[in-house]
Amino acid sequence: MMTETFINETYGINGITRISLKKIIKVFSFPNEINIKFSNKKKSIDIKFIYDGLEVYYMLYFFSENIEKPEYQTLYFDVKYIHLNDDSIKIGDEIKTVIPKIKKYLKRNKKNINFEYDEDKYTGRYLFDNKNIDIFFEKCRNKKIVDGIMISLPYEDILPENKDILNEIEDIIEIKNKIDNFFWK
């Protein structure tokens, strides 16, 4: 059964407005699969939660001069289907039906309806809401068909006063250190 997703009036989906893996698990339950990847130079940790119809991508970036201290984090949702108030969009929809729905959603929530657009011979994308809504399409004959929907949360700097974020990151760093010790020491 596909995971139900609803876009928030502010940022994110299903009431998730800040970056928190614990909140994601609380809202969507434990994922079907978890992938963890470390960059070759150990400057980032990428975690992917896989659900039916939803993938969550979390990235934690480190200062290049201090590999132990995280600098900022990002998170985005890759959805197959999402509700926009009284409308919805899904992979496989024609882009000409999706754009008016997104603009209606943005207008209703008093957001800027301007967008960025990029296209090549085979694919393209629309970026709305300060790049927090990203719609990818592929060209099939004379149609542009949606083949990706990503909803981003604004990136967050890792600041000492954000105790909840720091506690969650400490858990992630602990896992990273255990893996480092297992393979590299």
Give the role of each language-model region.
Residues 1-185:
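Short helix/turn-capping signatures at newly exposed starts of structured segments
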